Design a protein with these regions (language model features):
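N-terminal secretory signal peptides that target proteins for export/translocation
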Residues: 1-5
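Sec-dependent N-terminal signal peptides
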Residues: 7-22
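Extended, small-residue-rich solenoid/repeat segments and analogous flexible loops
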Residues: 34-92, 100
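Glycine-rich hexapeptide-repeat left-handed beta-helix
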Residues: 43-70, 104, 108-113, 118-160, ...
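Small cofactor-carrier domains centered on a conserved lysine used for covalent cofactor attachment
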Residues: 96
Length: 290
């Protein structure tokens, strides 16, 4: 291919790419005309083409209930974030671009008020029931107790519980069973799985906390730590006096202000009642039976 024809071809490809982006981007932000499904097309149950990032879960052998996310009106969910199923998003929570709260396996998932899920955060959980049988140690009570399947509190427990004023920094994975106490900071690219973090804990970047351990209140997990035994957790230093002593206060403040500010822009979703009306009007009739 000569140079002239090559330039012509690349120009055509560039124009086509721009046209595609101009079509996709406005709809991702709830702008422009939202196309209606053609005959034979399927739309996810209790989702909408205007807010495809927020929708209910599906029925499985480990989850017999269909649940829509519960989102407080003052929370901000970015259009490029995803919230599915049995997720509770509390007051003034910021859910940043590419963050995911996926309550379709282990449930429920709880994000307390004034907390933040920064870019790339994932919250998910292992199944908590199978064929309506409760699984031991797969849920936590709101006070941090780990629950057996026959515990009377199991039905009110959580696969993942994130308290209030908690910061989950960029790329954090919280995978249930997991518990994160109030005023706790979890640093970038860290993993918390099958573990409990107490109140006022600071976790340094790129740390791993797993193996059923419990990190006590006011502890500091140094960057890059791998905590897999209770002995390692008990030996952790105090947060006060560490480089992370006051980090969470500043991070919570920043993200609370961001949630407020973005909530005033057109990116913000409407009220829960408005969202439900659009979702009900736009979805196809779908069976709720397995």
């Amino acid at each position: 291919m000569d140079r002239k024809n090559y330039q012509l071809l690349t120009g055509i490809i560039a124009i086509a790419g721009i046209a595609i982006l101009m079509t996709i981007i406005p709809q991702c932000y709830g702008q422009g005309n939202v196309s209606q499904p053609q005959q034979g097309e399927q739309v996810a149950p209790n989702s909408s083409q205007q807010w495809p990032n927020i929708h209910e879960n599906v029925i499985t052998d480990f989850n017999s209930n269909v649940t829509s996310p519960s989102i407080q009106g003052s929370a901000f969910i970015h259009p490029f974030a995803v919230v599915i199923g049995n997720c509770y998003i509390g007051q003034n929570v910021l859910v940043a671009p590419t963050a995911v709260c996926r309550g379709d396996e282990g449930t429920p998932l709880y994000i307390g008020p004034f907390s933040n899920m920064q870019d790339g955060v994932v919250i998910h959980g292992l199944e908590t029931t199978v064929d309506d049988n409760n699984l031991d140690d797969r849920r936590f009570a709101s006070n941090g107790d780990r629950l057996l399947g026959n515990d009377t509190r199991f039905d009110d427990g959580y696969s993942v519980y994130v308290g209030e004023n908690v910061s989950l920094a960029h790329g954090v994975l919280i995978h249930g069973p997991a518990y994160v106490g109030n005023n706790t900071f979890v640093g970038m690219e860290s993993l918390v799985f099958d573990a409990k973090l107490g109140n006022d804990v600071a976790v340094g970047v790129s740390s791993t906390i797993t193996g059923g351990v419990e990190v006590a209140d006011d502890k500091f997990v140094p960057p890059g730590s791998v905590i897999t035994t209770q002995e390692e957790a008990d030996a952790l230093p105090e947060r006060v006096g560490s480089a992370y002593e006051n980090i969470n206060t500043a991070v919570v403040h920043v993200n609370e202000k961001l949630a407020d500010g973005y909530g005033e822009l057109g990116l913000e979703m409407p009220s829960a009642s408005e969202r439900e009306n659009v979702m009900e009007g736009g979805m196809l009739e779908t069976s709720r039976t397995p």
